């Protein structure tokens, strides 16, 4: 029996080949050479690339035996994940390969900025000795604010604490209990800005976080603060930061990332108080080596038919055929539970009832977590990293089964509990020969509406004319109602309406609707 073929298309460290083991046949190809790549992939069971080789639909179509594409790095811009998923090809990357390098680089920038090391170095190289011109500031005894407590943010917090600093943090998706476990005081962003002597930013770049540290935020910081951004370009307003340094409010800064890259012209480059590097956070030999060995291990597992860490798509995973159709619905239930919760829940419970309870359904717990975190995490949320994300943010998750399901052959309930004891419950089922997804319950109120598209959920005071006001305001804004269903509260004057719309609802229209019908709660959720 021939060994599976692993095709390496880009230059990788020798340790990568060693990590693949002796149960595969390793071949090499010049991946950027399109013709050579297309000629080599038909016999490949696995394809390993870095950033130089493009793996698109054409390459995938030419590789009928391909089971896994492994990107030795974090980004996946050169891999068509959707095309791979459509062909049942697993896609993996190495999301944790550079976290230590990135954390250390942030600390290097902070230290260099606090002691004016680059400016002092340049001065001495000009054959001048100006000790008095380069007085620095200690980290010991100071308050360091970490904005974003993901994997890298936590590493920075742990390491900076060793300097004798007091660490505070802002992250709306980390529970106070989890922060306490880390020995970190959790603050609002405004409080962190006001208290921190140093601020290090470690957030993903999303519409909500872009420009987070802007002119207004900088004005709230302590005089003499030092700011570091080694996360994503655009989180810090570079022009506003330059003005704050020039004006003397901000003492210094360190940046490894910029809103536009490559960046060779910035007002920050003219300031001696600013330390800049050209996006070097992951540029260490160890990070590159780790990326190769990480994906090699994923390839080894995939070819052995085992569960694969760091998978970024569903289609390549091995899931029971009775359970597979429920994955997307339960993900949507997780999204819905998260949106309806006032804050990130501290616990998530998935109950499987009816015939489906006879199957192995652990993957549905992961699917619900994927949905819960997908709206707040920039990187791909996978069946493997979802539990780690939950652990990092202090969210527990469980799954339970019950054979009884009076109204449906099978139904899945997702229950989210907040730190304040608030509870959100949502339920869904599959129906018909096409296994259409349906929402059947939200917070004890019964529905029968397809789980798809943009949905507006309003819990409001049920008075005559309320529905007309909602329809009029949406219509005036050019938003079409595709489907709607009303469920009245069992007791009291309240009702909940679920409307599926043809587009998102502008913020001002949401505000107007909430005021018009005395809404207790109004949320828009994308269930596409």
Curated annotation (Swiss-Prot):
Pfam families: 2-Hacid_dh (PF00389), 2-Hacid_dh_C (PF02826), ACT (PF01842), PGDH_inter (PF19304). NAD(+) binds at residues 151-152, 171, 230-232, 256, 279-282. SUPFAM superfamilies: ACT-like, Formate/glycerate dehydrogenase catalytic domain-like, NAD(P)-binding Rossmann-fold domains, Serine metabolism enzymes domain. One of its GO terms (molecular function) is phosphoglycerate dehydrogenase activity. Keywords: Amino-acid biosynthesis, NAD, Oxidoreductase, Serine biosynthesis. Its EC number is 1.1.1.95, 1.1.1.399. It comes from the Bacteria. InterPro entries: ACT-like_dom_sf, ACT_dom, ASB_dom_sf, D-2-hydroxyacid_DH, D-isomer_2_OHA_DH_cat_dom, D-isomer_DH_CS, D-isomer_DH_CS1, D-isomer_DH_NAD-bd. Belongs to the D-isomer specific 2-hydroxyacid dehydrogenase family. Catalyzes the reversible oxidation of 3-phospho-D-glycerate to 3-phosphonooxypyruvate, the first step of the phosphorylated L-serine biosynthesis pathway. Also catalyzes the reversible oxidation of 2-hydroxyglutarate to 2-oxoglutarate. This is D-3-phosphoglycerate dehydrogenase. It comes from Mycobacterium tuberculosis (strain ATCC 25618 / H37Rv). The gene is serA.
């Amino acid at each position: 029996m021939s060994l599976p073929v692993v095709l390496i298309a880009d230059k990788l460290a020798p340790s990568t080949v060693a990590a693949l083991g002796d149960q595969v046949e390793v071949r090499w190809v010049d991946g950027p050479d399109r013709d050579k790549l297309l000629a080599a992939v038909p016999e490949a069971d696995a394809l390993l690339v870095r950033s130089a080789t493009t793996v698109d639909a054409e390459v995938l179509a030419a590789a009928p035996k391909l089971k896994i594409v492994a990107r030795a790095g974090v980004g996946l811009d050169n891999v068509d994940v959707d095309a791979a998923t459509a062909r049942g090809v697993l896609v993996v990357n190495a999301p944790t390969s550079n976290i230590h390098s990135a954390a250390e680089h942030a600390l290097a920038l902070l230290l260099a900025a606090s002691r004016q090391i680059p400016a002092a170095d340049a001065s001495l190289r000009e054959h001048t000795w100006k000790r008095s011109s380069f007085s620095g500031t200690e980290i010991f005894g100071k308050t360091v604010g970490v904005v974003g407590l993901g994997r890298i943010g936590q590493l920075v917090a742990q390491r900076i604490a060793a300097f004798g600093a007091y660490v505070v943090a802002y992250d709306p998706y980390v529970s106070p209990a989890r922060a306490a476990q880390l020995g970190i005081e959790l603050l609002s962003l405004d409080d962190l800005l006001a208290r921190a002597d140093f601020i290090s930013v470690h957030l993903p770049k999303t519409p909500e976080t872009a420009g987070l540290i802007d002119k207004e935020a900088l004005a709230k910081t302590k005089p003499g603060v030092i700011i570091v951004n080694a996360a994503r370009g655009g989180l810090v307003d570079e022009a506003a930061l330059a003005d704050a340094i020039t004006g003397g409010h901000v003492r210094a800064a360190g940046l490894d990332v910029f809103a536009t890259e490559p960046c060779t012209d910035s007002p920050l480059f003219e300031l001696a108080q600013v330390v800049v590097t050209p996006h070097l956070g992951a540029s260490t030999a160890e990070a590159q080596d780790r990326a190769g060995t990480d994906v090699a291990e994923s390839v080894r597992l995939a070819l052995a038919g085992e569960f694969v860490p760091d998978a970024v798509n569903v289609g390549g995973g091995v899931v029971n055929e009775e359970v597979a159709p429920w994955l997307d619905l339960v993900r949507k239930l997780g999204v819905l539970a998260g949106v309806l919760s006032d804050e990130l829940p501290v616990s998530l419970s998935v109950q499987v009832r009816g015939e489906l309870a006879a199957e192995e359904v652990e993957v549905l717990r992961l699917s619900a977590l994927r949905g819960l975190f997908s709206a707040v995490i920039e990187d791909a949320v996978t069946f493997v990293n979802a539990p780690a994300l939950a652990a990092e943010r202090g969210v527990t998750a469980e799954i339970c089964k019950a054979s009884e399901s009076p109204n449906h052959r099978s139904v899945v309930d997702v229950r989210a509990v907040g730190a304040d004891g608030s509870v959100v419950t949502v339920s869904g089922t599959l129906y018909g020969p096409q296994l259409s997804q349906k929402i059947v319950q939200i917070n004890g109120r019964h529905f029968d509406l397809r789980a798809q598209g943009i949905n507006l959920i309003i819990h409001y005071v049920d008075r005559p004319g309320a529905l007309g006001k909602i329809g009029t305001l949406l219509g005036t804004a050019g938003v079409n109602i595709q489907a709607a269903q009303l469920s009245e509260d069992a007791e009291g004057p309240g009702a909940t309406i679920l409307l599926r719309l043809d587009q998102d609802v502008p913020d001002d229209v949401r505000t107007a609707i909430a005021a018009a019908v005395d809404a207790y709660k109004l949320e828009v959720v994308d269930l596409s």
